[in-house]
Amino acid sequence: MSINQQAYNAIKAIVGDRFISDDPAVMEGYRSGPAGYENGTGYERVMTVLPHAVCLPKDTEEISKVVKICARYDVPYVPYSTGFYGPRTHCHVENELIIDLKRTNQFEYDEKHFFFDVGSGVTLAACQQEAMNKGAYSVIGGGGAQCSAICNLIGDGWSPLSHRIGLPHRRILGTELVLPEGDVVKMGSLAVMDDPFWGEGPGPDLRGMLRGFTGLRGCLGIVSKMAIKTLPFQPEKLVPTGVAPNTALALPPRVRWFNFLMPNKPAQVEAMYQIGHAEIAAALTKVPKFWRAIAKAEDKEEFWKLWLVENEESLRDFFIVRVMLVGYTSQEDFDYQEKVLNDIMTELGGKPTRTKPSDESWIKNADSAGMWLMCGSYVSVDYIIESLTQATQHGDTYAELKKKYTPPLMPDFGDPGWFQGFEMGHQGYSEFLIYWDHREDVDGVDQFYVDTSKMNIKHRYYTSLLGPHQPLFLTGPMYGPNYHTWLLKVKEEFDPNWISHPPVPLAHDDFVNRAPWMQEMKDWETPEKLPMRQW
């Protein structure tokens, strides 16, 4: 063990013998990989290390005490809940402590006012089921129901259900944040009372410390507790069916998916505009053909049999709009929405196609933890939240650039990715995922990741993956402009010793400097020495 012995003993006195360890076998359990989100990259090989100790505090008070000890004894730490986000949620420097938040499992649901009050160890699965038991629902993001609810509220956390339900940052209510040196900030109504019912008022507020469209991955402290807004649902039960891994939710009469094959992409986009304008539907998305192959396949081998019969032409003419209607108030509500939907589709030339009377992917997201693993590794290389006009152009540019990096990236025949409308069409969303076999030479994966940032700058796309996800000195001068100077000033103010998940938010800059295969990509100005502490 390399962590200061006095610090270790002090943390043990707080959490108890059972909830701290420096056993090498236990530390192996916190190794990044071997498969999953962003695993199998050069970033993972270069930047991640095993922790030297792990502790499991149970609440905000214990987290605050542990962090104060880390600050006193100069111990770097990483906040960690379910670890879904791959290497970026793991230790990056030697002699580091993981603060595992699984024990922060406080859980209350205010049935009258429609919100949860939960700790960081509570998963989305628990939240969604409890909400549905009480006639409400929330959003489970693409990461899956096994992820921490709070993590999805402070980083990403959307899905086709975001067509109607507000984006995550709008649903953050009273929140407890442990700053990098241990002080506790209470946000929203918690600043003046014990009831977490309210987030913040209009205009800028402290929730901007937690996230933009994505989050800062723990480099500005630890969110230990949060109240999360839910919305009313319909009263009938969604019944689990099938035997794992082929499970689904059987939908009641007032909940139903519809698929429409559109004649072309402009009609596909216009349908999303009109559905939002009519203020109908609970969920709305484009369906890539890749998803359909995954849904049909029983295993990876069958997936490849289905997928490799496709080509650029078959994907070019595939324009599916998938819509979920929910009769929130009554069957008449559902019938009205269905009539409006059919009128829109008739006008635009959309033809209904068959779809199952069940849900496998979005209401509870039971399949998302494994459905992307057709190659062994994957990552959402970028996503944007802008207008539908921009979002629907974004993927085509990505698909063209991706040809340069295929292989090692999976052949996808020019598939431009996934897009949908957010918040009744007021915003558009585009996401581009990539897949590869981590057992092969994956230098091109890391290179493509950075090349997409250059592409965004060239085409003037707004990208959500700023901050710690790309080289800060590449994107910073071009967005804002100079948003990186503000981010680094905030980091220096709240964490001057860089003990909260170092070297984030400069981790990707550090990776580019350290990885030989990334040197050819580096054509932007960067300081000779990055303005961060060296551990």
Model-derived features with residue positions:
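Conserved glycine-rich FAD pyrophosphate-binding loop
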Residues: 44-52, 65-68, 74-76, 80-96, ...
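Conserved oxyanion/phosphate-binding beta-strand-loop segments in alpha/beta enzyme cores
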Residues: 14-42
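FAD-binding subdomain of flavoenzyme oxidoreductases
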Residues: 106-110, 120, 124-264, 532-535
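C-terminal cap/substrate-recognition region of VAO/PCMH-type FAD-linked oxidoreductases
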Residues: 202-205, 211, 227, 238-247, ...
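General beta-strand structural signal in soluble alpha/beta enzymes
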Residues: 19-24, 56-57, 77-81, 99-101, ...
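Short beta-strand-to-loop capping motifs
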Residues: 58, 259-267, 322-331, 383-390, ...
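Long, structured ligand/cofactor-binding scaffold of large enzymes
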Residues: 37-137, 148-160
